Amino acid sequence: ASTLTSYRFDRQKGTLKQLHAVSALPADYQGTSFASGLALSKNGDTLYVANRLHNSIAQFSVGAGGELKPVAETWTRGDYPRSLALSPDGRYLYALNQRSDNVTRFSVNPTDGKLSFVGGYLPIGSPSQMAFLPPAK
C-alpha cells in the first residue's frame, strides 16, 4: 500500500479531484508497508510521510500544481511509525514509533527540508499522536 494521493479541493462544491498518486516507498522495496502519518511544512512545499513496517519517513517536494516528487527517505530509528509532527517553528520533525514505544527527533534542514537524526529516544508507551500548544500569552 503506502500510496500517497493528492487531490484538488473545489471550495464551491466541496468535492475532491484526484491529481497524483505516487508510492511512498523506494522502488526496490518488496515487503508490506502502510503509509500512516503526514506532516506538511509551513510553506507547503515539503511533505513528510511515515511508512509503517518499512520504518521510514519519505520526503516529497510539492509542486505548484500539487505534484509530488520523491526527495529523500530517512529511517525512523524506531518500529511502526504511527504519526509525524513538525515543531511549530518547523525546525524539528518527530516520529511517533508505536511498537518500539518511543518518539525520535530529527532536525529539518532549512534549505532542502532533509532530515537528520538528532539523537536520543523519548520513551512513551505506544505513542500515537502529538500536538503543540500555542505559546503562552
Language-model segments: residues:
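Short loop/turn segments immediately following the C-termini of beta-strands
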Residues: A1, F9, R52, Q98, ...
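Structural signal for beta-propeller blades
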Residues: S2-L4, N55-I57, D101-V103
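Short loop/turn segments immediately following beta-strands, especially the blade-tip
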Residues: Y7-T15, F60-E67, S107-K114
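Beta-propeller fold detector
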Residues: L16-A24, K69-W75, L115-P123
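Blade-level signature of beta-propeller repeat domains, shared across WD40, Kelch, NHL, RCC1
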Residues: Q98-P110, S116-K137
